[in-house]
Amino acid sequence: MPLTLSHQQTDGDAVIALDGELDLASAPDLAELAGELVRNGAGNIIVDAQRLSFCDSSGLRILVSIANDLRPVGGRVSIVNPQPVVLRVLELTGLDRTVMIDWDPPQAG
């Protein structure tokens, strides 16, 4: 299933909603969008993973890269509402200790 990205940005926060599979084919799209949002002033990026059905190592690498890009400006990446299969991957790889995992509805601003 291809990945669909949507986003909104308010003040210092941006929400990126992911729908589908984050994998080798789609990870560059997320990287490009996140890079654009950071260049446009996003200090924090909230990834709405409610509809993310799969994430492979390419997707994980992009999430770590986004977190590293935000660190110098004091920002962070939060992943909200991950599906159990995605949460398990985050836990197995230790990424749940690098990014914040939350269960609240995402809001920019």
Label each residue range with its predicted role.
Residues 1-54, 64-109:
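STAS-like cytosolic regulatory interaction modules
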